[in-house]
Amino acid sequence: MSLDLALDIQHATTCDWLPTDEQFALWVTNAIGNSMNEAELTIRIVDSRESQMLNSTYRGKDKPTNVLSFPFEAPPEIELPLLGDLVICAAVVENEAREQQKTLEAHWAHMVVHGCLHLLGYDHIEDEEAEEMESLETQLIEGLGFTDPYKEQ
């Protein structure tokens, strides 16, 4: 199945290294390609301040986070390919990659795949859900040529 993807990438911060639009598109397509034929999605790259504000507002956690997912839910009678928005904090991704001894590219890919799975309805609150989501993430990330993101370095 081929995915018709409309991807809007918004850069609200700068950092040493960011994925290209093509990399983002590849990772999104890999994560959601078998779930739908058509998808619209926004990825917004933000600084720590914006991430912290959004995380505090929507999750009640007053600190920046790596990725926030905002699924779009249309009324049942309206069919739209709008999947939702991902907000990714570049500084948090950089820090986590360094702490976890991963390449920036591998960790960015993981955050995009992780966020897309949330947009598709996956979650990791309950242990069983977390196992299912992490297993799928690992499969998708390894399919992109990266190592298991949950394997200890």
From Swiss-Prot:
InterPro entries: MetalPrtase_cat_dom_sf_prd, YbeY, YbeY_CS. Coiled coil: none annotated. It is found in: Cytoplasm. Zn(2+) binds at residues 114, 118, 124. PROSITE patterns: UPF0054. Its EC number is 3.1.-.-. Keywords: Cytoplasm, Endonuclease, Hydrolase, Metal-binding, Nuclease, Ribosome biogenesis, rRNA processing, Zinc. GO terms for cellular component: cytoplasm. Binds 1 zinc ion. GO terms for biological process: rRNA processing. Signal peptide: none annotated. One of its GO terms (molecular function) is metalloendopeptidase activity. Gene3D superfamilies: Metalloproteases ('zincins'), catalytic domain. It comes from the Bacteria. Its cofactor is Zn(2+). The keyword Cell division does not apply. Single strand-specific metallo-endoribonuclease involved in late-stage 70S ribosome quality control and in maturation of the 3' terminus of the 16S rRNA. Belongs to the endoribonuclease YbeY family. This is Endoribonuclease YbeY. The lineage of its organism: Bacteria, Pseudomonadati, Pseudomonadota, Gammaproteobacteria, Alteromonadales.
